[in-house]
Structure formats: C-alpha cells, structure tokens
Amino acid sequence: VIFNNHVLGMVRQWQDLFYGKRYSATVLDDQVDFVKVSEGMGAKAYSVDTIEEFEKAFKEAIELNIPCVIDCHIDREDKVFPMVSPGAAISEAFDREDLNNKK
C-alpha cells in the first residue's frame, strides 16, 4: 500500500512537525505512475481515491494471493503514523496520540 500525497511525504511531515513548516524540495511535479511501475514488475496494481475503492481493491488483492500494489491518493496535508523523529531510533517511533499528548 502506497500512501501517495504527491510529495516526499515523510520529509514534508518532518518539515511540518519539527521545522516550523519550512518546506523545501518536497513537491513532486513529475509524478511516478506507481501502477505502471508495479505492473512492469509483474504485480497487480490498483489506483484508488476513496475508502470504498480502497476496500474493494484490498479485498481483491487479498483474495488473489499474488503480489499487489495499491496506490492510495491522499491529501498533501494528511499525516502518516507511526513515524520517527529526525535522528531518532526506530524504537522511538510514535503515533498521533503521542504527538497530541506532548502538546
């Protein structure tokens, strides 16, 4: 499953949460067609924009029992958790609830 917000998502998320929203070099103007790349490598691929489309693709992918990729288009401002702070170890990963508790 690809959470595709058409930017370098985790880098932008770091810039948003830890660097005062000072965005630099994160917007991807030339988009990768993840469906074509996946199909070129022999996987079944889906492109989805809604939760309903995702649920249908996910169910089919599980039933097929072959390599599948689901390219989920999400809003540029959506956050993805869990995540790791810059310079932190994977054992220090945190989720949205941890972030909210720090505020």
Task: Explain the meaning of each model-derived region.
Residues V1-K103:
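Thiamine diphosphate
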